[in-house]
């Protein structure tokens, strides 16, 4: 539904270098899953897209997108939707990038920019190609199919994924609006911390969430630096940089992977904090005043738009084919929604003026049937 709506609203055409091997029908609202073939890398990837409950219905509305590596461990997408829909963070599209069954070990190639030899095995070296896949192939693909804001994307990685995210920051801090770097395996790339330190002064307001588990301080099997060493080195490289909005967290009593759900819960709101509408004053209006807004409207493109009320007097906006959006009043004839940066104003004629991200659209009230 969202794909069709975006295309109907005139999303700009983009080249799509990725071949869709399969596009599974959604199993629930706000969920899409693709298997995409990358000619650049020569392999297929699974890409799962979760969209928040409050879906855009005005031309030009864009949402941030969080790109979660390792398929977000199956948690990032659903957790992100809950956080988006409850006002804990700015609503965002969650894009989880992973592998087909039996191919998860390709992460050892894709997530390491340099080769590493560990316990007699040599792997890695595919990070630059995977970085190009994300930035030049996957992001344009997602932005053509979903209302994702190209300037407000976030990269989220843990372990080797955290190492990859730190390497992307080191290459070009402005590649993403924000970075979530969890338990980065900096031991696998000894030059990483120095590169991050050199890149940090070039950042322009990047929001970074840096974490490690308290119990990750034990030495690596066979010796070498620890995850905690990597965390401390990255913290020193990023702390105090004027262009980096940094939050760092050591999760007490947690191991390498056990804190991952908390990493999502805490990290997403840092990189995408809830917007101003959440702090708007909610005025209380008489029931008779509320009732005058209820009715059927028509958008300029012909789509029906209705406003209804529930038993508690709350107002809801409905666009055909999409979930209802709750409306909270913040003054006479003015409403906002906490899950989208949007507002609705009723004028003297009873028509509505809906605004999203500075754009407006007028919806005329339908005449009552005789």
Where are these regions (language model features)?
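Peripheral terminal and inter-domain segments
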Residues: 275-370
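Alpha/beta-hydrolase fold nucleophile elbow
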Residues: 147-158, 179
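A domain-start/cap signature at the N-terminus of enzymes
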Residues: 15-63
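Gly/Ala-rich beta-loop-alpha elbow adjacent to hydrolase catalytic centers
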Residues: 157-161, 165
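Conserved hydrolase catalytic core segment
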Residues: 167-177
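Active-site nucleophile loop of the alpha/beta-hydrolase fold
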Residues: 99-101, 180-188, 213-216
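C-terminal catalytic histidine-bearing segment of alpha/beta-hydrolase fold enzymes
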Residues: 211, 217, 228-232, 239-282
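Serine-hydrolase catalytic machinery in alpha/beta-hydrolase-like enzymes
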Residues: 62-133, 137, 141, 145
């Amino acid at each position: 539904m969202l794909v069709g709506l975006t295309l109907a609203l005139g999303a700009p055409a983009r080249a799509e270098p990725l071949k869709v091997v399969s596009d599974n029908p959604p199993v629930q609202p706000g969920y899409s899953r693709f298997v995409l073939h990358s000619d650049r890398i020569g392999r297929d990837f699974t890409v799962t897209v979760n969209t928040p409950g409050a879906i855009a219905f005005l031309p030009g509305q864009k949402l941030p997108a969080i790109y979660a590596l390792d398929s977000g461990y199956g948690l990032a997408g659903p957790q992100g939707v809950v956080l988006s829909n409850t006002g804990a963070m700015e609503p965002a599209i969650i894009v989880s990038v992973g592998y087909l069954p039996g191919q998860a070990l390709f992460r050892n190639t894709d997530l390491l920019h340099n080769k590493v030899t560990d316990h007699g095995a040599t792997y890695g070296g595919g990070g630059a190609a995977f970085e190009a896949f994300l930035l030049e192939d996957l992001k344009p693909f997602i932005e053509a199919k979903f209302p994702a804001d190209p300037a407000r994307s976030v990269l989220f990685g843990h372990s080797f994924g955290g190492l990859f995210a730190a390497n992307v920051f080191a290459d070009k801090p402005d590649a993403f609006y924000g970075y979530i770097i969890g338990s980065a395996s900096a031991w696998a790339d000894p030059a990483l911390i120095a590169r991050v330190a050199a890149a940090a002064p070039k950042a322009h307001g990047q929001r970074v969430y840096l974490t490690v588990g308290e119990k990750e301080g034990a030495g690596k099997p066979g010796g070498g630096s620890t995850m905690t060493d990597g965390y401390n080195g990255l913290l020193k490289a990023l702390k105090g940089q004027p262009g980096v909005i940094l939050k760092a967290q050591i999760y007490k009593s947690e191991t390498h992977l056990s804190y991952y759900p908390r990493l999502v819960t805490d990290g997403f709101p840092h990189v995408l904090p809830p917007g101003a509408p959440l702090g708007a004053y909610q005025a209380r209006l008489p029931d008779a005043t509320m009732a005058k807004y209820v009715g059927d409207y028509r958008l300029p493109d012909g789509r029906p738009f209705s406003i209804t009320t529930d038993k508690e007097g709350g107002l809801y906006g409905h666009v055909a084919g999409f979930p209802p959006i709750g409306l909270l009043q913040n003054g006479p004839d003015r409403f906002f929604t906490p899950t989208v940066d949007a507002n609705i104003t009723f004028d003297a004629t009873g028509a509505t003026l809906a605004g999203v991200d500075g754009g407006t659209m007028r919806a005329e009230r339908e005449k009552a049937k005789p």
